[in-house]
């Protein structure tokens, strides 16, 4: 995969956050349109993170058409944040908070920067949800510390790794209650297991893209799988970006779908 095979385009488009994508009938429709999926991903009944133990986490907030949007992201260099395309598409600018545990507290460790420079993958299409990846360029380089640090990305030698069967975790400030959709002030996490994409295809009734990873919660856990854009991490390495879950709710046992980071290693401007 050549360095120039992918290119950036400035994020533009309509607001599709908090919109459930579903169909009323499966008759006569392609498989990709048959499944009901949600663009919202939230951690339900997750555990609170030890404060500042995940210094790579970024909280991404913006307002689109008078609607406040909250996403997750990860710091991949001192001036770049990795997130999902859906988190910046349609936005004119975003607030990126680093070094946070409790978003409602004025923690000394927190830094909030406003960026209007963010890019989505040129092949991203909301209807298909493939290539759901974007990079936010911060206006200045941030000082790295025990509170703000970059996350490790896979090596090129990891491109063929499916990670199936491996334990992973995802974190975010998303919902803690599937019914009331209450957001969490503090960073929370959930342990997951990477599962074969075939299991996702059974759940969602359409063929998964080659750039996607599926992960499920441990047996008996009623969760969704993290804020959109949040990193999926295996052994301290980010292998995925939270993309979407089921429209039927966060406690219905559907796996979460994540963008596969290894597919985009040569696309990232590092």
Features from the language model and the residues they span:
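Protease-domain processing segments flanking chymotrypsin-fold serine proteases, especially trypsin-like
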Residues: 1-82, 95-100, 212
């Amino acid at each position: 995969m050549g360095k120039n095979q992918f290119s950036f385009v400035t994020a533009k488009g309509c607001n599709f956050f908090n919109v459930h994508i579903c169909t009323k009938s499966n008759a006569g429709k392609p498989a990709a349109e048959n499944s009901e999926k949600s663009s919202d991903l939230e951690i339900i009944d997750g555990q609170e993170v030890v404060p500042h133990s995940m210094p790579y986490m970024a909280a991404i907030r913006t307002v689109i058409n008078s609607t406040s949007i909250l996403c997750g992201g990860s710091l991949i260099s001192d001036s770049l944040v990795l997130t999902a395309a859906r988190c910046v598409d349609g936005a004119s600018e975003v607030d990126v908070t680093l070094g946070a545990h409790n978003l409602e507290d004025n923690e000394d460790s927190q830094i909030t920067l406003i960026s209007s420079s963010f890019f989505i993958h040129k092949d991203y299409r909301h209807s298909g949800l493939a290539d759901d990846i974007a990079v936010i360029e911060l206006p200045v380089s941030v000082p790295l510390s025990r509170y703000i640090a970059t996350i490790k990305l896979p090596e090129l030698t990891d491109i063929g790794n499916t990670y199936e069967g491996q334990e992973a975790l995802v974190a975010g400030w998303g919902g803690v209650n599937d019914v009331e959709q209450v957001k969490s002030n503090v960073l929370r996490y959930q342990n997951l297991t990477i599962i074969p994409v075939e299991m996702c295809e059974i759940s969602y009734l359409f063929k998964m893209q080659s750039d996607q990873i599926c992960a499920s919660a441990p047996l008996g856990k009623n969760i969704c799988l993290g804020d959109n854009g949040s990193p999926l991490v295996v052994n301290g390495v980010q292998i995925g970006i939270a993309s979407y879950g089921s429209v039927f709710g966060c406690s219905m046992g559907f796996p979460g779908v994540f963008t596969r980071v290894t597919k985009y290693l040569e696309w990232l401007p590092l």
